[in-house]
Amino acid sequence: MKITLLSTAYPYRGGIAVFTERLARAFQQEGDKVNISTFSLQYPNFLFPGKSQYASSERPSDLDITAEVNSINPFNWFRIGRKIKKQKPDILILKYWIPFMAPCLGTISRIVKRNKHTKVIVVVDNIIPHEKRFGDNFLSKYFVNSVDGFVAMSKSVYDDLILFDAKKCILGVHPLYDNF
């Protein structure tokens, strides 16, 4: 199968990047052709609460990672959407963890699905954020309506997801990491 992952990955650090890279390797071990499309800009610096968004480690040599998605530039979303649409992966796997990403990921998903071939599946860490903000439900609803299915990483997220769309969701409990 031809699989595109659109998620946080190197040069970014953190649990989502580790998960994405590990998932890509698992698909590769099964014989699938995998590429990762990650962010050229994930968050503007003033929105990032930590010390640094970036990894201090070496670039993974066994993964095809392209930093190209700008989370706040709609022109970029259309360009990336058209690019992935043209590549026609069998599956586009998105990672969703915060409604801030809904306009970007939802727009890209809608464009890709126009190729009538690619299925868009989302691995969800949170659909309703811990720190709720005005507009979160609207943004998440926009995103939910753009994809074919969800894998919730916990029972509580599954319960939140079925409030948006019970038909598209399965529970796949978060795996233990084997990279430590």
For each feature predicted by the language model, list its residue ranges.
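Extreme N-terminal starter segment of soluble prokaryotic enzymes
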Residues: 1-4
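N-terminal strand-loop element at the rim of the active site
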Residues: 7-13, 25-86, 157, 162
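A short, glycine/small-residue-rich beta-strand->loop->alpha-helix junction that serves as a flexible
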Residues: 7-22, 97-102, 131
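An aromatic- and histidine-rich active-site surface loop
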Residues: 74-80, 92-116
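Proline-aspartate-enriched helix->loop->beta-strand connector
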Residues: 88-90
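Nucleotide-sugar donor phosphate/pyrophosphate-binding loop at the beta->alpha transition
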Residues: 116-121, 127-146, 155, 178
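Donor nucleotide-sugar binding/catalytic pocket of nucleotide-sugar-dependent glycosyltransferases
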Residues: 145-180
